[in-house]
């Protein structure tokens, strides 16, 4: 262990199902082979962290949440040759893979049959230090702001990676539904991908903001029929659904043009879809599960090159419960980030 590394550190932990976070001091342990000890600079607070609190994915307790981690390498496991002390490093939702399953053999490491998830199946980044696996470690540029870029490791890579895999050519009409943590980034990425971007939201006061982020058109769905408005524009080649509003799924399908794709990035639960809305015009419904380490590096490099701005509110570690509550209430604009 490096001489500057302390023997103890603080972490925020869920001790039992449904409870709030407990801030505690614990002993620092060395990383094992294929592990990296990270001195955390910032960790985003994502709605998926609620899965840790409720044990929805079976991570158990106690558990430190957080999967939008940026920091510096404090120590490396035995035999490590790529990472060294002081390197800028990140940890995302994807926390590790076996490299042998069918998904891994196809390069979809974030879909691994035995995937580990930071902050869900292993302790995450609501802490001064955390340990991440080397195969899931993300190279982070030295010059980027840790708090601003931490959410890129979930919200950013999710919208970036999903949209690029839809293979929509530049110049096509792309609509973004929702202007929250995912949506405000999706608007910016879509604009920089070269699309004609339409923002869909239920609030007329957000139009100016949406246009500043890169929207060429704005549809207030509380005042205007989104189907008619999108069809008047020619029908969307892609609609990205970022807000969990199940009742809007069928109307969004009707807003697609011929061979249009509806990309669902928010978990809305069970929905009914009229298949007749799909078959006649070759429309389809898609989803995409975040990304692996290289995808995260691509999302960050693209954001850095094009000036994509993640809007955040910062909270110190001892205000972790306030940060979590603001995220759950939807009062934060637009991503809460815990800074050390």
Swiss-Prot record:
It is an enzyme of class 1 (oxidoreductase). Binds 2 Zn(2+) ions per subunit. GO terms for molecular function: alcohol dehydrogenase (NAD+) activity; alcohol dehydrogenase (NADP+) activity; metal ion binding; oxidoreductase activity; polyketide synthase activity. GO terms for biological process: patulin biosynthetic process. Induction: Expression is correlated with the production of patulin. Expression is positively regulated by the secondary metabolism regulator laeA. Expression is strongly decreased with increased sucrose concentrations. This decrease is lost in the presence of malic acid. Expression is increased with pH changes from 2.5 to 3.5 in the presence of a limiting concentration of sucrose, 50 mM. Natural phenols present in apple fruits such as chlorogenic acid or the flavonoid epicatechin modulate patulin biosynthesis. Disulfide bonds: none annotated. NAD(+) binds at residues 47, 178-183, 198-203, 206, 265-267, 289-291, 297-299. Belongs to the zinc-containing alcohol dehydrogenase family. This is Alcohol dehydrogenase patD. The lineage of its organism: Eukaryota, Fungi, Dikarya, Ascomycota, Pezizomycotina. The gene is patD.
């Amino acid at each position: 262990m490096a001489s500057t590394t302390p023997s103890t550190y603080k972490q925020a932990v869920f001790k039992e199902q449904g409870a709030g976070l407990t801030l505690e001091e614990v002993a620092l342990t060395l990383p094992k082979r294929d592990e990296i000890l990270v001195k955390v600079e910032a960790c985003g607070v994502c709605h998926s962290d609620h899965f840790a609190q409720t044990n929805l994915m079976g991570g158990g307790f106690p558990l430190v949440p957080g999967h939008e981690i940026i920091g510096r390498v404090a120590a490396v496991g035995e035999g490590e040759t790529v990472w060294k002390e002081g390197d800028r490093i990140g940890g995302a939702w994807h926390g590790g893979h076996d490299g042998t399953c069918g998904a891994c053999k196809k390069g979809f490491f974030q879909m691994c049959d035995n995937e580990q998830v930071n902050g869900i199946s292993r302790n995450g980044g609501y802490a001064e230090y955390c340990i991440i696996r080397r195969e899931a470690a993300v190279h982070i540029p030295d010059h980027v702001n840790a708090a601003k870029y931490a959410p890129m490791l979930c919200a950013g890579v999710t919208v970036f990676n999903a949209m690029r895999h839809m293979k929509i050519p530049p110049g096509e009409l792309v609509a973004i539904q929702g202007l929250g943590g995912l949506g405000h980034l999706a608007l910016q990425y879509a604009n920089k991908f070269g699309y004609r971007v339409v923002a869909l939201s239920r609030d007329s006061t957000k139009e100016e903001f949406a246009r500043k982020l890169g929207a060429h058109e704005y549809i207030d769905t509380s005042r205007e029929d989104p189907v008619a408005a999108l069809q008047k524009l020619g029908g969307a080649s892609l609609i990205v659904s970022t807000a969990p509003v199940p009742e809007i799924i069928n109307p969004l399908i009707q807003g697609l043009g011929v061979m249009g794709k509806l990309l669902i990035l928010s978990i809305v639960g069970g929905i009914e879809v009229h298949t007749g809305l799909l078959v006649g015009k070759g429309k389809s419904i898609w989803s995409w599960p975040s990304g692996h380490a290289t995808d995260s590096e691509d999302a960050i490099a693209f954001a850095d090159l094009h000036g994509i701005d993640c809007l955040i509110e910062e909270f110190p570690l001892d205000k972790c419960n306030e940060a979590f509550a603001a995220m759950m209430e939807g009062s934060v604009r637009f991503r809460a980030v815990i800074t050390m």
